[in-house]
Amino acid sequence: MISWPNFIAQLFNGLALGALLALISSGLTIIYGTLGVLNLAHGAMFMLGGYAGYVAYTYTDSFIIAVIAGSAFVMVLGVLMERVIIRHFYHRPHEDQLLVTFGLSICFVEIARFFFGSLSKTIPPPPPFSGITSLGFMFYPTYRLAAVGIIAVALLALFLVLYRTRLGMIVRAGIEDAVMVESLGINVYRVFMIVFGIGAMAAGFAGIINAPIASLTPDMGEAILVQTFVVVVIGGVGSFPGAVLGGLIAGEIISITSMINPGYAYVMLFAVMTLVLVVRPHGLLGTRGRE
């Protein structure tokens, strides 16, 4: 018998996971929506962000510095990836994009394993958010509540960039018609570089925020990548609001199903994805956009 406090705790766990998936998926969806690149290395960006934050924390004992340093590292790595490798695959078949980004993902995982080993690493939560908080009817880890708030602020910042700045206007126009944007004299390749960097940074930032909740391992990006792609499909490719909505839905599905039977969490997640595709082939908030 499942008690109400346990059920509500699982709802909170689903909210925390959903917020994390929303942030990672928002980066992936704007990358694919703008650049048309299926980035299988996105999960590795999540993992590398966590490890970069771990290194920064080891030397500074500052969680804030760890977040800044880890996010900056992954953003720079994303920019370099776009300029050196990804740029040559914009007009190539998706199969080529999958192969090259899958290869990059394997390289990043093995590099992390070489430097950090296979044993898990952890970053403690910052002192103000350590311990547990009483919600009246139950106790809940303070950091998980804080993580939801931090990610919400990050999503709001990304929303403002996409919908309240000239760069965001160009990015959203590029999602609809990249050729039209280029015909207006805009350097789309510079925009692509910035978008890839922002998308990678979103994943890296999520990796650091998640580090005090789940241990860091070189393979941690693989499972999150699968969940992220499902979120993008549910929400709609290229849709930022869709990524947020899809992330929250996926988080609750995984959390609630895991409480009943952990073995069926992914089954239920893919079942919901299939149902969404049957009813709305372009996702809940997606449009036809890029083919």
Language-model-derived ranges and their functions:
Residues 2-20, 161-166, 192-234, 254-264:
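Inter-helical junctions in multi-pass inner-membrane proteins, predominant
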Residues 1-23, 52, 63-66, 92-98, ...:
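Membrane-interfacial amphipathic/re-entrant helices at transmembrane-helix boundaries
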Residues 12, 34-80, 84, 89, ...:
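Membrane-embedded helix boundary and interhelical linker motif in transport proteins
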Residues 19, 26-50, 91-97, 167-170, ...:
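Short, non-helical or kinked segments that cap or interrupt transmembrane helices
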Residues 17-18, 138-216, 240-246:
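Helix-loop-helix "hairpin" substructures at the membrane interface of multi-pass membrane proteins
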Residues 61-105, 111, 245-250, 280-281:
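Alpha-helical transmembrane segments within multi-pass membrane transporters and channels
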Residues 88-89, 93-164, 191, 256, ...:
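Transmembrane helix-bundle core of multi-pass membrane transporters
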Residues 6, 24, 84, 115, ...:
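Cytosolic-side transmembrane-helix boundaries in multi-pass membrane proteins
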